[in-house]
From Swiss-Prot:
Keywords on record: Disulfide bond, Hydrolase, Metal-binding, Metalloprotease, Protease, Secreted, Signal, Zinc, Zymogen
InterPro entries (alphabetical): Dup_hybrid_motif, Pept_M23A_Blytic
Enzyme Commission (EC) number: 3.4.24.32
Propeptide stretch(es), residue numbers: 25-195
Sequence similarity: Belongs to the peptidase M23A family.
Protein's recorded name: Beta-lytic metalloendopeptidase
Secretion signal span: 1-24
Primary localisation category: secreted
Binding site for Zn(2+): 316, 318
Amino acid sequence: MKKISKAGLGLALVCALATIGGNAARRATAQRRGSGVFYDEMFDFDIDAHLAKHAPHLHKHSEEISHWAGYSGISRSVDRADGAAERAVTPSARRIVRSASWRAPTASARRPARSRWRCASRCTSAIPTRQGAGDAGPRQSAAGAVRAFRRQRAGGRAARRRRVPAGLRPPVQRTAPGQGGFGPLRQGRPGRAAVSPNGLLQFPFPRGASWHVGGAHTNTGSGNYPMSSLDMSRGGGWGSNQNGNWVSASAAGSFKRHSSCFAEIVHTGGWSTTYYHLMNIQYNTGANVSMNTAIANPANTQAQALCNGGQSTGPHEHWSLKQNGSFYHLNGTYLSGYRITATGSSYDTNCSRFYLTKNGQNYCYGYYVNPGPN
């Protein structure tokens, strides 16, 4: 569905630089604490305030950085990530960190001395691994910004390192392709214990309304795993009136406004749902919303729908399911009492490979009325 734009490429690199330093204040609600360290950091680390204080020249990019952090599952409260960002623009280092599989932050991430370097080799996951010649400019520009900022900080960092015995410094963590890691490939493999329980989530549009539900796909729109996402719409082209079509919360939880077109709601049990291609977002970060609460409209202009990059052919919402910050394969999960089967590849609408089951009856892609969570 979406490809990372050239601007997004540069901003993904800047993300690693921009989140340097800082200890996040721990003020998470009981619900968020139960959902894991990743979500605590998502709410507690204020990117906008951090950039205003520590990197004012990057402050104008705070929304894009939040978007890409939410899009890719990158933790925000990291340190020593500037070096990783510069290394990421070289082919040799990109081969080291190219793995699509990350490991979710563990409880040790709560200790600031360690949590700030956890992303040292991972802040580049949003960077495309296949680059064309035309992509060199944004990558080199981002690298230049990283190097300039590193020179500015070099003296102070060197002094700090001299005060820390070498044996106590955290090692640079490198993830080889196909091994371990912090990401989508860790979630939803056969034998997984966690499946979104029946009754937790409803369709992300108002109860009683009928929206078109398309085939399952990955968050990027290509490949077949994890197919975490569904596109839903009421129809209409660019410029159509979408003000009466409301995207609604799939379940109660804490609201995160990543950008003007992208939001996330953190639910119980480590689950969260994301909503992209939006306009008129109704809530700010930290708000508590109930299931079925209207949160936004599908964007009716391509510029707004793609406020942080990607592709879209018309007004719709791109809905995704996450578990502990990683996109989660929908096969076997429940939505409004329907059990989802998704065994093909992205956007496959063949009814033998993508269908929803309820009360013993299978239903293909098409229009669905939202009955609520069951």
